[in-house]
Amino acid sequence: MVSSDWPIIMCGDFSEKFFMDGTKEVKHRREFGHQGGELSEQGARGTVAGLYSEIRDTMGLSMVNLIYRRMATEEGVLEWVWAWINGAINSLDIEDELAQLSDGVAWPAVKSVQRASLPLLGIDEVEEIKLASVLSQYNRGNSLNLLLLNAFLSQLKKRKVLQGPRMQPLKARRVHVKELPPILDLGQMGQDTAAVVRVLAKYVSPPGSLMIPSLFRHLAHWPGFLALVAPHILQSIANGEVRKVSSCLKERAVSKVSALRLQTTDIITEKVPSIDIRDYWAEEIDSYLQKPIPEMIVIGNMIESILPDEEK
């Protein structure tokens, strides 16, 4: 199976009235999503657009992670998974859980660049703020998903597909979340930058498939910086550091999930997908949890450490 992270581009005039028809919205999701594809944030309408907005607000992010954009291509899957995740995130002290997940982790060591060098990479003060925000949000999002999706699979394996954490009032995660620049398609990048993105993606994709992590596509906005960090990423992958640290994160996440005390209720969603669809997405989620999600946490934090310290 080939999993593409390329955005789904929508054309034509799509009115709100069109998407009030549930049948037409399902058709839309099937047309603009396919097995291995995604439904982009720009292409989302109706129910999916509402879910994306709720995901961003609840998780304290300005973007929707790839795994959820993938789920949105299959009718009912994102609704089903997010109903459980939304309940979980609101029944936990999630900020404390996140802090414990990364507490004391030794990220692969990389020397930070001097602030005076950033203009040589095409990064001024404004762009540095944007870049730092991209990195911090991906590190947060991937860490949340490592915890919450592991918890979801744990409950699914116990056949608690109709059970989930009791829904709590929505909690504001941040007072303000900076808007991120758009995710770039490979065709919107320079040829050399697209080649770098493809190479990096090759080493973090799940076994037997190809996906392009959205972080790399976001970093393509700063091709000079991406070219600078790419060798460090590849070296840390080659020497086993990324695998070692990501394995530690996976073990911590699984251990924390087993200790979580989630309040449950009987029904959290009106419709649960068929067993075949549940099995497919359980495997898909697990493949992301085994490699790209934990490895991108390591890579994201490593890249973040390259940015200048406040005093530099």
Model-predicted segments: where are they?
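Hydrophobic alpha-helical segments
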Residues: 1, 6-312
